């Protein structure tokens, strides 16, 4: 039973179209949410110790959602937290485009992957001849990020991930119970999950999602190939996770739905 293991409280936060899509059929970055939705997402991220998202989501956006509001940064500091939550990329392969803006953002970066990745080279966004950032700039300890000279050394190269978590795998897929237990060992108590649909499906199937925030946006995307909040193999109706509606809030033309997953 997942309620008996030490793990973070996990909340899925997604914006969806009125017909339940999180992106269009060609999987363009989903930027159809309003400024209100973006502010809501930032609030949820600010309330979390870490943010989890899949490699596909990272490739689509190239960046991650960080806390920008001075008020929210101050709230985190008053709670004894670093200015930014940990940003965790989940990927079976550690191969990334080293020039993604994500690797220049002033956030702590972790990689969650399987044991088969241990001997694969990890990305460093520093181009040939480019100097490493000074420990006084965005990589300083004051931002909760390891300075370059303390970053991980993997396969003889400096990785731009501050920590790599090697979770157990089953059938080539991440063992999410093991992964969540490892996150708890690193004092991650609240986890925000931002997609994509395959990752959400895997964590939900493992019984590890506690709450969902869905922003219903006023557009129809359609398309049989357009991704949905929960992909994977799906659930039979009799075995589908049941939800309890906690709150409904309309802001402008959007509706914010807050659910708890029944155990």
Residue ranges and their predicted role:
Residues 1-121, 125-129, 137-139, 145, ...:
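Enzymes that bind and transform nitrogen-containing heteroaromatic metabolites
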